[in-house]
Amino acid sequence: MPSGALDRLMKLRDDPYAMARSWKERTGSKVLGFFCCYAPEEMMHAAGALPVRITGENRDISKSAAHLQSYCCSLARTGLDMALDGTLSFLDGTVFVHTCDTMQRLSDIWRLNAGFAVHADIIIPVRFETDSAWAYMIAELSSFKEKLSEFLGPIDDAAIIESIKLYNKNRALLSEVYDLRRANPEVLPYDQALWIVASSALMEKSEHNALVEEILSDLKEAPSPATDDRVPLFGIGSVMDQWEFLKMVEESGATFIDDDFCDGRRYFDTLAREDLPPVEAIAHRLWDRKTCPCKHAPSKERAKCIVEEAKASGAKGVIFFQFKFCEPHAFDYPHVKKALDAAQIPSLNLEIEQGSVSIEQMRTRVSALVETIKS
């Protein structure tokens, strides 16, 4: 009999920060928000805080328009709106990692207007794989550790190592969910698999680990479903929270078999080493993991990696989900698209924006891609 763990996680989608608010009320400890998956969550956790990811919201803007231009991405605009209208009032502070110009400037606006007790910026290098970039990354993470200590008290290296182990366990469990579904997409709707990953950054990791272990047990015990004849697709983008759209793709005769979303596989990609000093271990993971359009690593050329990953997943087509006014993904698209064309992998680029997705218009375009692949 199913444990109900998946149902408990899916209910969180209606109120993403419910677990964080409950945790704070229960423990009296601090909650720190972050936007980017390059944030060193293990350090925050080791300091006794709960790291919680801010992913914006599908909402109309009420307060942030006075601070941000209309050509900023909806992730920045809705995130700031949530801070200004009290939705994020449970936060004690926010950690910004440099990703793009919008987020870099949002950090200053946030610091001056959101009113949280602590504010930190981490400037992760844009270009990896040089000695100077490595030294700079170590210095930035060490500086962040010191700043956390000023706010939360001394952070013991042993505590960071334990947090690394806890987060590694979570990454391994999430990888198992994705790999299980890749082998048999019928076992779990894609939007639920993606939410299992996204919810990991919204609650205490030990609680999430327990729930995912139950979900995996349920999935492994479930009867084998019928053969899946849907077209397997690969998704590319930053944060993906357009759940109705993902369901629509499955209604169109396709399903996502894997992805390169920063709240999907890219979030749990690569374990941190447990045989190194903690700051180095965290730095190595950020250094070694899959890069996003905001970073560059010569040995992991992004277009080539995307093609290899799409092929390995068994995907027959690719859909790009590009936030309107997202410059990093806009610059990334032509290069990756060219590589996909050379590999004869059909693709579709969809512009999305939180709060204004036209499902039916996109349904027509997705159906056309599916029919093209089938033919």
Feature-to-residue mapping (PLM):
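A charged, amphipathic alpha-helical module
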Residues: M1-K30, I138, S142, E146-T270, ...
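Short, charged, surface-exposed secondary-structure boundary motifs
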Residues: D60-Q69, E129-A133, R265-A272, S358-E360
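Short, acidic/turn-prone active-site loops that include or flank metal/cofactor-
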Residues: T55-I61, I123-R127, D260-R265, E353-Q354
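Redox- and metal-dependent alpha/beta enzyme cores, enriched for Fe-S-associated oxidoreductases
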Residues: R26, C37-Y38, M43-T55, G237-K311
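Acidic/His-rich segments in extracytoplasmic proteins that coordinate ligands and/or metal ions
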Residues: T78-E150
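TerminUS-proximal long segments
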Residues: A303-A310, A315-G317, F321-S375
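Metallocofactor- and cofactor-centric catalytic cores in central/energy metabolism, strongly enriched
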Residues: S3, K11-E25, S29-C37, E41-E42, ...
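Glycine-rich, highly charged phosphate/nucleotide-binding loops
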Residues: L68-D85, K295-V307
